[in-house]
Amino acid sequence: MITDRVSDYLEKIEKSDINAFIDLNGERVLKEAKDLEKNEKLKNKSLYGKIIAVKSNINVEGYKISCASKTLDNYTGTYDATVIKKLRSEGALIIGMTNMDEFASGSSGETSYYGPTKNPKALDRIPGGSSSGSAAAVSADLCDMALGSDTGGSIRNPASHCGVVGFKPTYGVVSRQGLCDLAMSFDQIGPLTKTAEDSLNLTNVIKGLDLSNTTSLKTPKFEKKEIKDYKIGVVREFMDVTDEKIRNEIEKGIEVFRDLGCEIVDLSYKYIDLALPTYYLINYVEFYSATRKYDGRRFGEVIEEACGEEVLRRILIGKHISEQEFSGKYYKKALQARKEMKKEMIGLFNSVDLIVGPTVPKLPHKIGEELSPMEMYAYDVLTVLTNICGICSGVVGCGNINGIPVGLQIQGASLDDEKVLSAMIEFENNY
């Protein structure tokens, strides 16, 4: 019975101490489960009875949509985002809203107003961010699957650290309607799941053209394909910036593709040094623009008076480089760099089907450990390129180091989501 499964998850969440959830309504979800059991029309749907957690920056009517910030602590969603409507139409249940880095501005899961989320696989370590609660909830078996958002690695980073599967679709494949913006030209909603097959199925449900989101795209259903003859690229620079222990695990993973009949091709990407400055300059400007609505009149409190240190840092830098006298010096140059980086990435995919490598260059630090902003941003060096270039990328488990999971990142060209998802499934089945 669906109600029994919901009750079991609610009990596990209640007993859990990893701080994965911000808002729960057990009475509501149990009633929805009872109604679902009686709904004959939904019984053959692809997500019938699946219990899904949702990151707290995706609107769900009647739940607290706080973006893990004091700024929006009293804000309740007044409508369902497009992806939530799609989940419900396929028979899924929303169990609650998950913790995250405040306004998705972080890579650790530590900047939430509600306190840090713990990594279920290493309780003294960060789970990664910003979709920390969604990844941790899936990892700790507190739900069947979850939704997160990915601006520069926010699905893939915690997927790697928590030992789950994460997928960032091509920009536009999934509607952003109902998502609270961090950086609108980077943001993308995607799944966090226990298996790669589940990521394929969940992506197929949430994707598609949405007339209320002009950047959304119409795409055919993604199917699992043979990858036997694929050319798999390995970028030297991605491996070079990665800790040796992680690199060793990734190299074992690359051999799985060789054993599957793929050709391994060595590649070079000359703009790795521009990845972080380009990403963060654009991120700062777009985030500053996105936060102007949090003025204390329309939504919640004045953001600058209520937010945490990292969010305030991004707002102040974004304001500074948005000013007319500086925009040409910083922002316009970042846009020019982005154009060159995309061109270079397209060139790589002209010679290979996919690129595989590490997700995060270092192991997660201990919760509360002091890191400088630049040390924290370094977590993102291998994931931001996917968002800068508007391509797709997934993460699957690839071993562990003293029990701490390592994730293999599989990148595909724009709209090659089907290839990436197929490779994720094949890798997981043969690792």
Swiss-Prot record:
GO cellular component: glutamyl-tRNA(Gln) amidotransferase complex
Enzyme type, top EC level: ligase
PROSITE patterns: AMIDASES (PS00571)
Transmembrane portions of the chain: none
Alphabetical UniProt keywords: ATP-binding, Ligase, Nucleotide-binding, Protein biosynthesis
Catalytic activity of the protein: L-glutamyl-tRNA(Gln) + L-glutamine + ATP + H2O = L-glutaminyl-tRNA(Gln) + L-glutamate + ADP + phosphate + H(+)
Domain of life: Archaea
UniProt EC number: 6.3.5.7
Function of the molecule: Allows the formation of correctly charged Gln-tRNA(Gln) through the transamidation of misacylated Glu-tRNA(Gln) in organisms which lack glutaminyl-tRNA synthetase. The reaction takes place in the presence of glutamine and ATP through an activated gamma-phospho-Glu-tRNA(Gln).
Summary of subunit composition and partner proteins: Heterotrimer of A, B and C subunits.
Family named by the database record: Belongs to the amidase family. GatA subfamily.
Protein name: Glutamyl-tRNA(Gln) amidotransferase subunit A
Protein source organism: Methanococcus vannielii (strain ATCC 35089 / DSM 1224 / JCM 13029 / OCM 148 / SB)
Upper classification of the organism: Archaea, Methanobacteriati, Methanobacteriota, Methanomada group, Methanococci
Gene that this polypeptide is encoded by: gatA
